[in-house]
Amino acid sequence: MGILEKIAEIEHEISRTQKNKATEYHLGLLKAKLAKYRQQLLEPTGKGGAKGEGFDVMKSGDARVAMVGFPSVGKSTLLSSMTSTHSEAAGYEFTTLTCIPGVISYNGANIQLLDLPGIIEGASQGKGRGRQVISVAKTADLILMMLDAGKSDQQKMLLERELEAVGIRLNKKPPNIYVKQKKVGGVKFTNTVPLTHCNEKLIMTVLHEYKIFNADVIFREDCTVDEFIDVIQGNRVYMTCLYVYNKVDQISIEEIDRLARMPHHVVISCEMNLNMDYLLEKMWEYLALVRVYTKKPGNAPDLGPEDGIILRGGATIEHCCHALHRSIAAQLRYAIVWGTSTKFSPQRVGLHHKLDHEDVIQIVKK
């Protein structure tokens, strides 16, 4: 029996098994086996084949955004309207056959936008170019899930299922679970919060399925057995995702209002150029980029649209130093910061001070 047949058999067994106290260990074992087989399917052991043409796109700019979606939902039209790149668009499916990059200039940042070929159902099983599309999507900082507003619920459900199957977790944080394997001593299980979704016996069942017999396991939050399996696998990618509903000019006002009120959702029309500015604002918010400015002693800071340094949200003075030159952090005596990240403006700070958007920094060397 091949891996695909084993996966299908386990999925069928899970779907027909009632969820209750008596079956939770059986279901936990099935889910662990399913995760193992999916990993084997998506990560072949051989050195096999060359990369697909157009998929080895070099990462550039300050952030990378990947558009995923079914064929003919408007990905190519969106890329062409938001960047200077032309991506072939037509009224038939599978117009885009390779990965096409474009660059969005916004708030002084260069954001790389990738138009990936349309994902079809079964991409997690290697159908079409699904595996290549998903491997590129995993390198992005933000996923734009393009959906046809007229088919939104069905497309969204299928895409989420495909991405879930390949280890991409959308708008979720990694579970606060610590697992450390050791050579001897058996399994030591500790939980710092009450567990409502699993217990020690179920955890042991999953560990034994993965041939783990000696380990320290600490649950610092109430997690499900699926989240515990994700931690053991260790190859899950946790990504922010914006659900972009295109072609809203073809649906009712009531449906547009319903979609727009849902979390992580944006409604647009590429053809009519509706709500594109709001989409850019949400992309900037979800990428969590900050722009900071530098100044020399005795001089005014350069606050022009092309000046400043783009950093990740939560970046510190140390990150800013590395962005300027790798030797500056070692030579830093202190930094003076003007902006919202300090209690006083200006204020003297050290290497580990976190910066806010549009802070002004003066570096003082030793």
Swiss-Prot record:
Keywords: GTP-binding, Nucleotide-binding
PANTHER family membership: DEVELOPMENTALLY-REGULATED GTP-BINDING PROTEIN 2 (PTHR43127)
InterPro entries in alphabetical order: Beta-grasp_dom_sf (IPR012675), DRG (IPR045001), G_OBG (IPR031167), GTP-bd (IPR006073), GTP-binding_2 (IPR031662), GTP1-OBG_CS (IPR006074), P-loop_NTPase (IPR027417), Small_GTP-bd (IPR005225)
CDD domains: DRG, TGS_DRG2
Family named by the database record: Belongs to the TRAFAC class OBG-HflX-like GTPase superfamily. OBG GTPase family.
Domain (OBG-type G) ranges: 63-288
Gene3D superfamilies: 3.10.20.30, 6.10.140.1070
One GO term of the biological process aspect: cytoplasmic translation
Name this protein carries in UniProt: Uncharacterized GTP-binding protein C02F5.3
GO molecular function: GTP binding; GTPase activity
GO CC field: cytoplasm
Manganese recorded as keyword: no
Domain TGS: 288-365
Signal peptide segment: none
The keyword Hydrolase appears for this protein: no
Binding residues annotated for GTP, in chain numbering: 69-76, 115-119, 246-249
